UniProtKB/Swiss-Prot annotation:
The gene is rpmB. Residues 1-24 are annotated as: Disordered. Signal peptide: none annotated. This is Large ribosomal subunit protein bL28. Residues 1-22 have a biased composition (Polar residues). It comes from Sinorhizobium medicae (strain WSM419) (Ensifer medicae).
Length: 96
């Protein structure tokens, strides 16, 4: 399991710890990942995803998983999230 968000693609970044004496040592900045269960209204199912805390706030802000995935750029999404997005688009097309 990689250390990256399935919805936003946010991942590990590298940088330096800088001491008071300006000594630099390498370090990693890890994303704040949470295992959450999100509900798709269009599909009527629950999905367990590993997302960052910032992505979770964005999902809530946009009005749920369906709205977030429909508005998201497909290149940033994981393969699993892309599949979910395609299923939601297909279901919406059938309903219309």
């Amino acid at each position: 399991m990689s250390r990256s968000c399935e919805l936003t693609g946010k991942g590990v970044q590298s940088g330096n710890n800088v001491s008071h004496a300006n000594n630099k040592t390498k370090r990693k900045f890890l994303p704040n990942l949470c295992n959450v269960t999100l509900i798709s209204d269009a599909l009527g199912q629950r999905f367990r995803l590993r997302v960052s805390a910032a992505a979770l706030r964005s999902v809530e802000h946009r009005g749920g998983l369906d709205a977030f995935l429909l508005k998201a750029d497909e290149t940033e999404l994981s393969m699993r999230a892309r599949l979910l997005r395609r299923q939601i688009v297909k279901k919406a097309a059938e309903a219309a």
